[in-house]
């Protein structure tokens, strides 16, 4: 995961200090890209321990089209707690836009199901896109989509995915985003009869919060270790049938966890 450490170092050395919505302050750059070959291991950060359980359950929650944190809470995942209302609702966030995008004529569009079908039927299409950024509903969301749009690409029997992330919390959020979209790419590849290719991560505003500088410096002192391998149950051929038990991580040997505050 040298690419991730390179991003962190680049922002610390070359970023612009800015104020932000949360009042914490950031150092940021605009426009940056990382690439991960999914054939060379699962890109789960090794320079600090990550909570894989949260990453998997959040992705399954997105794919269910769910926007209430009850499923997450039932599975001991708390990453969305700060943004939910008293009933656990978040408004029309990721899952709603992925699976139930509202059309002007009253229909609801299942973008995920549509893109799976298109990958199978027309893999050379340049329209293999899912968007979570819905301008008509952004103000109703507890948190507007940070990872806003992703596109798939098929070549030589391999499925690759590129994510555009408008806003990226490098220390806390980005490691989760890398693992989540890498896993989604692997799942999509399996159900479409393809191998997983690359995950390409493209950023708009990539930033380190000022209260994460010390933690970032500590992480940069650590040497990356070999990437783990993600095993996925080969019997699952329907994207919406995956369960937590269908995933097994092998060979994960990270450095210790580094605690940092979330800016809300």
Curated annotation (Swiss-Prot):
Task: Name the Gene3D superfamilies for this protein.
Answer: Thymidylate synthase/dCMP hydroxymethylase domain
Q: Where in the cell is it found?
A: Cytoplasm
Chief subcellular location: cytoplasm
UniProt-recorded Gene Ontology molecular function terms: thymidylate synthase activity
Q: Which reaction is catalysed here?
A: dUMP + (6R)-5,10-methylene-5,6,7,8-tetrahydrofolate = 7,8-dihydrofolate + dTMP
SUPFAM superfamilies given for it?
Thymidylate synthase/dCMP hydroxymethylase
PROSITE patterns, per this entry?
Answer: THYMIDYLATE_SYNTHASE (PS00091)
Which Gene Ontology CC terms are recorded? cytosol
Under the subunit heading, UniProt states:
Homodimer.
HAMAP family, from UniProt?
Thymidy_synth_bact (MF_00008)
Protein name, as recorded: Thymidylate synthase
Q: Which organism is it from?
A: Neisseria meningitidis serogroup C / serotype 2a (strain ATCC 700532 / DSM 15464 / FAM18)
